[in-house]
């Protein structure tokens, strides 16, 4: 039975999946937007939100936990200084996934995952 086994396998071994998600979260936090498949974006969102929440904690242990995943000091500094300050008053939901059609080669559904810019919580029309 598959009780308590959350997360998607993404057709990869566990080490390949972990490495891919680490690289993707590093790129996502550096550029604040990534174009990828729907399922990868959904897995990436979990990890990215956790990293930003660690940045909001701001202590040394949180910084070390973030470095264990991201492994790029410049990106970790950005998380703890810029992103943590931007989302200080926001209790989660730092990212959004926008459907972007289908990839030409294999018709895989493509999405753009990006950081939410509007921090007020209201939509502007």
UniProtKB/Swiss-Prot annotation:
Transmembrane segments: none annotated. GO terms for cellular component: cytosolic large ribosomal subunit. Keywords: Ribonucleoprotein, Ribosomal protein. Pfam families: Ribosomal_L17 (PF01196). One of its GO terms (molecular function) is structural constituent of ribosome. SUPFAM superfamilies: Prokaryotic ribosomal protein L17. InterPro entries: Ribosomal_bL17 (IPR000456), Ribosomal_bL17_sf (IPR036373). One of its GO terms (biological process) is translation. Gene3D superfamilies: Ribosomal protein L17. PANTHER family: LARGE RIBOSOMAL SUBUNIT PROTEIN BL17M, RIBOSOMAL PROTEIN L17. HAMAP family: Ribosomal_bL17 (MF_01368). Belongs to the bacterial ribosomal protein bL17 family. Part of the 50S ribosomal subunit. Contacts protein L32. This is Large ribosomal subunit protein bL17. The lineage of its organism: Bacteria, Pseudomonadati, Thermodesulfobacteriota, Syntrophia, Syntrophales. The gene is rplQ.
